Amino acid sequence: MNEVVIPSVLQDGSVRTPEPRKQNLLDLDREGLERFFADTLGEARYRAHQVMKWIHHRYVTDFDQMTDLGKALRAKLHQHAEVLVPNVVFDKPSADGTHKWLLAMGTDGKNAIETVYIPDKGRGTLCVSSQVGCGLNCSFCSTATQGFNRNLTTAEIIGQVWVAARHLGNVPHQQRRLTNVVMMGMGEPLMNFDNVVRAMSVMRDDLGYGLASKRVTLSTSGLVPMIDRLSTESDVSLAVSLHAANDALRESLVPLNKKYPIAELMESCARYLRGSKKRDSVTFEYTLMKGINDQPEHARQLARLMRQFDNAVQSKDAGKVNLIPFNPFPGTRYERSGETEIRAFQKILLDAQVLTMVRRTRGDDIDAACGQLKGQVMDRTRRQAEFRRTLEGQADRDAAA
């Protein structure tokens, strides 16, 4: 990957050629790193493997500390490469052991995301973001109130895992405190497909974090064509933000349903399972909101949908349900369902032989619970105003020219 470097003319008439931008090695999976070492550095493939382990196993970002690399190779790395990880703005522990990091992406202060670690009975799950903000406008999600800013790079996605694993003292293949990763943070992962898939490759690589495919879960609101593409490029676990089992209600909660209604979504999920013997189920997430989608009829609709899905895949428990009590945030019109309603909803599903779990709320005292992540993204009105000012400034400069 050769970058074109464009010279600039200075006021005194001299020409200055800027230095080529260095390659952030955190942006590369194993294949990309091998290619970079061969094409740019002229080095053997095993050298790329050594560096990958230094970065992801030992959390070393200074080439001079990579002691099994020769001096000449370290010099070439300094010239052509760097390892840039997200900056930790703050980290905040919860009373229940949950831990949240606010990570700065870039230098303008407007691009920050949140990453959450949830320990629970011998496992540790990291909730990772894929975008700064989100553009899908799900009406019950805090992130949606901030609008969409941009996609995260591969380095910014896997960098969240790096920051958390380093903080936790995680040692891949030995001392595992980070056992699962869920792409359920800020953003819609399938709208940042290439960067997310590349980052998940590092998560699952033995030279990276060594997680089994079933321990990496991608959660989507239902981009049908991208689910089909994911089926051909990755074997991770799939979760779907369903939240309603009829189109009219789901459209009011998840506007994407207008483009990809439930029938199309369920068909794509069935294709995903049929695409590999390694995949045996899809998790359907259902956030329970008081008086909105928590009534017995809603539970019966969901039970029917899960039975239809099992029949389509020809496998029992192909569809699993994860009930999520709604987590309130400032300005929302929704309320959490009561414990009685939650248990009654679950009982209807269990009686219909639908495998159903209720997700215990974690980290709500630090706004780290499901649906509460929003980072420090400029709100949409301010961002649109800034964009208009930028356009006006450009127009003034064009007129002056």
Swiss-Prot record:
- GO CC terms: cytoplasm
Q: Which residues bind [4Fe-4S] cluster?
A: 134, 138, 141
Kindly list the positions annotated as binding S-adenosyl-L-methionine: 187-188, 219, 241-243, 327
Q: Can you give the residue ranges of the Radical SAM core domain? A: 120-365
The record's top EC class is transferase
Q: Which Cys-Cys disulphide bridges does the record give?
A: 127-370
UniProt cofactor note: Binds 1 [4Fe-4S] cluster. The cluster is coordinated with 3 cysteines and an exchangeable S-adenosyl-L-methionine.
What keywords does the record list, in alphabetical order? 4Fe-4S, Cytoplasm, Disulfide bond, Iron, Iron-sulfur, Metal-binding, Methyltransferase, rRNA processing, S-adenosyl-L-methionine, Transferase, tRNA processing
Database matches in CDD domains: Radical_SAM
Q: Mention any additional remark.
A: Reaction proceeds by a ping-pong mechanism involving intermediate methylation of a conserved cysteine residue.
Question: Would you identify the family this protein belongs to, as annotated?
Answer: Belongs to the radical SAM superfamily. RlmN family.
Its biological purpose: Specifically methylates position 2 of adenine 2503 in 23S rRNA and position 2 of adenine 37 in tRNAs. m2A2503 modification seems to play a crucial role in the proofreading step occurring at the peptidyl transferase center and thus would serve to optimize ribosomal fidelity.
Protein name from the UniProt record = Dual-specificity RNA methyltransferase RlmN
State the organism named in the record: Xanthomonas axonopodis pv. citri (strain 306)
Q: Which gene encodes it?
A: rlmN
